Amino acid sequence: MAGAFLLLWVLSAAGCAQGGGGADPAATVLVFKHGKLSGDGAVVSELLREFEQRRPGVLVREELLPASSDRQHQYYAMNLDGGKAPFDLLAVDTIWVQEFAKAGWVAPLDDLLPQAERDEFFPGPIMAATFDHKLYAVPWYVDAGVLYYRRDLLDRHGIAPPATWPELVHAARVILDAEQDAELAGFVWQGKQYEGLICAALEVIRSHGTDLWTGDRGRAETGLQFLRDTISVHGITPLSTSMADEESTRRLFGDGRALFMRNWPYAWSLLERAGSPVRGKIGMAPLPSFAGHAAAPVLGGWLLAVPQHSPRREAARELIRFLTSPDAQRRIAVAIGYNPARRALYAEKSLLDIRPVLKDLYPIFLAARPRPVTPYYLMLSQSAQPEVSALVVGRKTARETLEAVRRHAERLAIDEGAPFVEAPL
């Protein structure tokens, strides 16, 4: 029954289309698949119509997939694996490019983006888009983990945004003890058993100079233990964190019920919109680190790629150049708050006047590190998720968790042969 439902969803996905109606039968029709964007995605449709005007004889049909990245990945894998995907351009998560390239599902784009132009983008997305020394996708917009904080409450108690994890714990405890508000949490983060949990764990562990799958075991255990201690020792993180994702933590923080939150930049515009209980009361900062080490935000974001066997590859490549141009990225940043992948835009006064938060995000994106750059990343992550989840709920110690995570990785290495490359510390 589940398989039948999935098949029906895959077959019906093509019906969620925008544009291209009443197409000239002689025109080249490009099908562009991407996930539903938050906010008003009309700006993308407007850009596609503009591309059609610039490229007579080409029409673009925009077909939306669910916002869930898991469901998007499932759809792409099912359709690309057969070599006859019903689309010509696709938006891919940073963690998929290696897998899709190794499988031969997407075409190399080296000549589309020469090295000199690649340097105009943040380095993390370019690293994630490169497999076997070839570029397979072009960065569309970028994300990284950030720390949100209640600026009003920190100011009231004379506390600066924390630069280290111990400082965050201290700040949260001081304010919680002073406020005596039973509904106020100190620090919320994504602890549900899913990819967001691995991102949160990586950011803490890497900010101690090591990594989850490789590197110094003692420092990695300390990082894992810190996550558990925010719940069980320091009492600054709710027990419900074991079920928390990005949206549930955003709602909690947005309702004024948390001091600190780890999340992605998308939350900023939602927290600052009219009617928000915390509008004008929040700040954004780099994630903390352990003393003597740098913050280590996990890279997120999406890139554009072309199916290997698309008969309309040249037109699709032109569309990639158009959608990743400075003008297109600028307009998307203004309209829906998605962050440009091109670095120079963060120095444009006209854009900063509209979105001043970009000034704070620039150094964070510059420091953002991809998750392990490997075609097997999803297997690595999926094997680690239940182990780290067991730590969050107290069923495993930090040592037991790390041993299990690395044991799974070693087995994968044996089965697949040196399956992953860590992003440089």
Language model feature labels by segment:
Residues F5, L11-Q98, P161, A291, ...:
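Conserved N-terminal structural module of periplasmic/extracytoplasmic solute-binding proteins
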Residues R49, A77, R156-H157, R228-T237, ...:
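Extracytoplasmic/periplasmic substrate-recognition and gating elements
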Residues E50, P56-F121, A128-T130, D152, ...:
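Extracytoplasmic "Venus flytrap"/periplasmic binding protein-like
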Residues D93-A144, V169, A185-G186, L197-A200, ...:
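Hinge/lid segment of periplasmic solute-binding proteins
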Residues V97-E99, W264-R279:
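A ligand-binding cleft/hinge motif common to bilobed small-molecule-binding domains
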Residues A128, I282-A285, V334-P386, A390, ...:
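Long, aromatic- and glycine/proline-rich binding clefts that accommodate carbohydrate-like moieties
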Residues Y136-W140, G145, V169-T214, A258:
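Extracytoplasmic/periplasmic solute-binding protein
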Residues A172-V174, L212-S242, L287:
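Glycine-centered hinge/linker elements that transmit conformational signals in sensory
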